[in-house]
Amino acid sequence: MEEKTKIGIIICDRYHRCAGGKCFRSLRNREGAFSRYKDMEVEVVGYTTCDGCPGGNVEYAVEEMMGNGAKAIHLATGLVVGYPPCPHITYFYDFIKTKYGLEVVYGTHPIPQKYLTMHNKLGTWNDPTWQEIIQPTLVDEKTRLTYD
């Protein structure tokens, strides 16, 4: 039997009441940033918020997730699509990789179409760095619409 891939998910604190429905649906369906786990068994070993700007919980939550076997940390799609998107997301990515040596993935569920439309109007993601950040969750329009 293949060993489970254990992951942690960090969401934006402004969504602290989020039940994770889109994240867990996309994990089950292997959509968005979870498509990387196609044909793999995955276990979520941690799900928490950053604790609000500037993200003080990131330092401690990742350590706990590692203690539960996490090999990858997903910075949830809410950090990417919020208005405004998280100003600390690239720092979180670099910090987790550097301090813990874990794989860090931008996003969880596919970007909903309504967010893509608005961010395109705003020009939010025109920068090459943002183009890299949205890539794992930028799926086809039909799928994006199911996440609206």
Question: What are these language model-derived features?
Answer:
Residues 1-65, 85-88, 102, 110, ...:
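Conserved mixed alpha/beta catalytic, RNA-binding, or beta-rich assembly cores of soluble enzyme
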Residues 59-94:
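Mid-chain, well-packed structural core segment of small domains
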Residues 96-103:
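Alpha-helix-loop-beta-strand connector modules within alpha/beta enzyme cores
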Residues 77-81, 108-113:
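Short beta-alpha junction loops
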